[in-house]
Amino acid sequence: MPKVLVTGSSGFIVPHVIESCLKNNYEVIGIDVNDPVIKDERCKYIKDDVRNLNEKDLKDIDYIIHLAFITNIPHSIQNPIKTTDDNIQMTVGLLDKAEKANCKKF
């Protein structure tokens, strides 16, 4: 069974993404700094920051659906450049780790 990592698993759209993955027989792992919006016993959830993942964590992951972003609106308004930079760095860092771990798709 292919394994998919869904980042930002407490986000608004993620329940639909996870449900679609499960219907298509994917093993699903969600990661977010917050508790998941939906709790499905068929999914494994990790409560952590995506930036803390390493290559070893991704070694058995076939696909990554990256939906994690800093969405704190007051912080984003006060620090738009830092927030944008942090989001870009998070994505680039995850892409780099995924490539080194030989993930099939990002």
What are the functions of these language-model segments?
Residues M1-F106:
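N-terminal Rossmann-like NAD(P)+-binding domain of SDR-like oxidoreductases, especially those catalyzing
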